[in-house]
Amino acid sequence: MKNIRNFSIIAHIDHGKSTLSDRIIQLCGGLSDREMEAQVLDSMDLERERGITIKAQSVTLDYKAQDGQVYQLNFIDTPGHVDFSYEVSRSLAACEGALLVVDAGQGVEAQTLANCYTAIEMDLEVVPVLNKIDLPAADPDRVAQEIEDIVGIDATDAVRCSAKTGVGVGDVLERLVRDIPAPEGEPEAPLQALIIDSWFDNYLGVVSLIRIKNGTLRKGDKVKVMTTGQTYNADRLGIFTPKQVDRDVLNCGEVGWLVCAIKDIHGAPVGDTLTLARNPADVALPGFKKVKPQVYAGLFPVSSDDYDAFRDALGKLSLNDASLFYEPETSTALGFGFRCGFLGLLHMEIIQERLEREYDLDLITTAPTVVYEVETTRNEVIYVDSPSKLPAVNNIQELREPIAECHMLLPQEFLGNVITLCIEKRGVQTNMVYHGNQVALTYEIPMAEVVLDFFDRLKSTSRGYASLDYGFKRFQASDMVRVDVMVNSERVDALALITHRANANVRGRELVEKMKELIPRQQFDIAIQAAIGNQIIARSTVKQLRKNVLAKCYGGDVSRKKKLLQKQKEGKKRMKQIGNVELPQEAFLAILHVGKD
C-alpha cells in the first residue's frame, strides 16, 4: 500500500490538464506509441470537438521511480469548467493529493482558485506545477509569485514542465511520489468502497468506478450497496490503463472499475458505499454533498413518439452525470417532456447535445430560468422553477430571486469594462483586492443574469482574460414580473419568461420583434403580443400573404373591384377564426438570444 499514490489533476480551462495526462500515460507506458493519440482521456466526441474535459476519467499506471521502487499511480483527470465543478469535487474525494497545474503564461485564474480551495478543504496535499514553459510568453517566476500571493501555497520550488514537448514531466512524477502521501486504510477491515462515478454499458449494465478505502474486493464476492441494502455479485473488476483491464482483486487504496450486472440504473448511486454481504462495514463512507441545480429548462421531444426513448436516455445520462435533475412536465404548446435542472448554461448545452447525439433524439428546449422563492398571500413559501408555475400576481406577497456571489480575476486594464458590465447586470460590489497586475473582484449578481449570458459577455469585454467562479449565496426580495407571449391572442406557455420590471418592456419588445422575424407568414395576420398580467407591453404583426384578386380586372367599374376585395376579406376573416399557427423551433430559441446583440 505504501507504494500507491492517488491524485487528481486540477486546473483552469485550457491550462493543459489533458495534455499533461497524455504525457504521464506515455512516460509510464500505459499505452503503446501506436495507440497514443492527443487527449487520450477525452473519450467523448463532444469533448474533443470543444476541446474541453466534461467527464472525469481515471487511469492506473505503474511508474518506476529513481529510487528503484515501482509505484502504482491512480490518477483522475478532471474538468476545469465552472459548470462541472461537481465532477471535480467527486474526483478529489477519491484522492490523497492533487497536481495544481497553472499556465506559466496566463497565471492564476478564478477556476484554479476554486478547485484548489476545494482540494485544501478536503485535506489534500497540493503540488503546484507550472506548465507551458516552452511558450515565448511564459514567465514562471512571476506566476510562482502569483500562486503564493493569491492561492497562498508555497510555490518557490514548483515543478516547471511543458506537457506539449514533454520537458520536466519526469520531475513532476518524482515530486508526486515524494510529496503526496500513500493512502491510509486497513486491508484486513471490512470492505468499504466509495462509488466515484458510474455509467451505463448496453452489454454489461452499470459499470462503477470505485475507490477502496478499507478491505479488499475479490472477483465473485457478494457486495452490498449500503443505502439500498441490495446485494449483487462482483462479476468483473479491474483497472483502466486507459484500456479496461480485468483483474482478480482490487486491494486497499486502489481505484478500479466494477461490473455487477446491475440492470436498474438507480442500483448503485454515485457517492454510495459498497461493502461485503457476509462481513458488512458498520458505517457508510461520507458521500458527496448533493449539488442543487442552478438553471432549469424544459426539454421536449419534437415528435411525441420519442417520449419513452427520451425518458430512458435521461435515466442513463443522469446515472453518468449525478448533477442532472429531471421531472416530467406537460405544456399545452409542446406536449409531454421533462423539466431538467442543470448547473449552468454550458452544462445544459452539453446535456442537450449528448441526448441528440448519443441517443439520436430531436429536442426543443425552452428558455432557461432559475429557481425563485415566492411568498404567497397565504404566507406559504414555494419554490418556482418555471414561469408557468408562478402564481397569479394578486396572490404573490413577495418574490425573491437567487443572488450569486461571483469571484472574478482579471488584469487591471479591463477593470472599468468589467465593472460596467456588472452594474448593467444589477450587481453589487462587495470586495476588490489588487494582486500585482491582477485584480480580484467580488460581486453579488442575480443568478438569472449570471446564467443567461454573463460568462460570454465577461469574456468578450476582457478579451478572454477575465475568469469567473460563482456560487449561490441567498434569496433576496426583488421586483420580478412574468412576461407572457401571446400569439393570435393565445398564451404560449413555453415562451413566458420571468424578468425584472425595469427590463420587462425592453425584453418584451425585443422578444416580440425577434418572433416576428421567425414566424412564417400565413394566409392571415398574426398578432404577437407581450403582456404582464393583462397589460399589453409590446405588439407586432406578421403580415398576411394575399393573392392579388384584382389582377384579372382590366379597367372597368370600381364596384367590381370592391366586390372582389370584400369577398377576399371575408375569406381571410373566416380563416383567422379557425386557423392555428405552427411555431417553428427557432421561435423557442429566440428567447435565449434576447438581449445578446
Swiss-Prot record:
Coiled coil: none annotated. One of its GO terms (molecular function) is guanosine tetraphosphate binding. One of its GO terms (biological process) is positive regulation of translation. GO terms for cellular component: plasma membrane. Belongs to the TRAFAC class translation factor GTPase superfamily. Classic translation factor GTPase family. LepA subfamily. This is Elongation factor 4. It is found in: Cell inner membrane. It catalyses: GTP + H2O = GDP + phosphate + H(+). It comes from the Bacteria. PROSITE patterns: G_TR_1, G_TR_2. Its main location: membrane. HAMAP family: LepA (MF_00071). GTP binds at D14, H15, G16, K17, S18, T19, N131, K132, I133, D134.
